[in-house]
């Protein structure tokens, strides 16, 4: 069973704290911004979430279109929803955005990061207008599943249930 530590997800004091939670050295951070996103949609995890995080170090960043602090609660509800203030997509749906500008060391021309995509909308909203997505733009989207699809509930490749979080579905790394 999922072990829940109510203190394992905390809100970041600054956007830079999210970057540091991802293992980015403070000296490599040029700027960090939530670009108007509701701070309730982001968190710093300090205990295992599902079977993946943290991968390195003791912390990781959480970006959510709902309450980030809910990510480590038991999956014992039919619905998990919260309307965030702040940014919305063109369709009026909640959106959380984290913008990083990093110092690039001389001779380095690539970067990598691990992510897992979790959603409460799986499987009941697959193929519907409700379509959680994840993108990472550098400057164009670089987050795709192994079939080349954008990461979303409607593509569902690699999304499985019983992922050790409060969410109904999630991807592997």
What do the PLM-derived regions correspond to, one by one?
Residues 2-173:
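Aromatic (Trp/Tyr/Phe) and Gly/Pro-enriched flexible surface segments
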């Amino acid at each position: 069973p999922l072990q829940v530590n109510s203190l394992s997800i905390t809100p970041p004091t600054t956007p830079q704290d999210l970057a540091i939670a991802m293992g980015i050295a403070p000296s490599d951070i040029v700027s960090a911004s939530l670009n108007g996103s509701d701070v309730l949609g982001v968190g710093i995890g300090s205990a295992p979430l599902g079977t993946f995080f943290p991968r390195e170090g003791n912390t990781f960043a959480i970006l959510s279109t709902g309450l980030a602090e809910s990510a480590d609660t038991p999956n014992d509800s039919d619905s998990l929803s919260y309307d965030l203030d702040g940014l919305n997509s063109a369709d009026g749906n909640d959106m959380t955005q984290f913008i990083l500008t990093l110092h690039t060391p001389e001779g380095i021309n690539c970067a990598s990061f691990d992510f897992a995509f979790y959603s409460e909308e799986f499987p009941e909203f697959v193929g519907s207008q409700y379509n959680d997505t994840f993108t990472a733009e550098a400057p164009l989207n670089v987050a795709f599943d192994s079939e080349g699809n954008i990461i979303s509930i409607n593509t569902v490749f690699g999304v499985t249930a019983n992922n050790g979080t409060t969410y109904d579905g999630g991807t592997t790394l």
